[in-house]
């Protein structure tokens, strides 16, 4: 094996653009790096800004609408066409405690606490929906 063969096999072809610049960054390289850093900071700002937002419970009955924070415990009574529906907010979640409906599906429903969750007493026309920004617990949008 000759020395020249070994040397040729271990070296890569010359990069003429890098050689012409002398291995230095150009103005365009600096702009690309600055753009990537700016986009990273911008996206991080929006991701962290949305975390830990206040969640509220939106209750609707007919044309009436009420909004309550989920971090304050209380019992709410809403009068619907069939009678009074009782809603309890406790430990950051809301549930229907009592309702005059015959089937009681709204009472059996688990408490709503995450943004986008809802419950309804259809016979009495009472709807509960959780609003806010809660990116702390992202979930896949799928049927479970």
UniProtKB/Swiss-Prot annotation:
Superkingdom of the source species: Bacteria
Entry's transmembrane regions: 25-47
InterPro entries: NusG_2_sf, NusG_dom2
Topology within the bilayer: Single-pass membrane protein
GO cellular component, one term: membrane
Keywords on record: Membrane, Transmembrane, Transmembrane helix
Pfam family, one: NusG_II
Subcellular localization: Membrane
Location, primary (coarse class): membrane
Name of the protein in question: Uncharacterized protein TP_1032
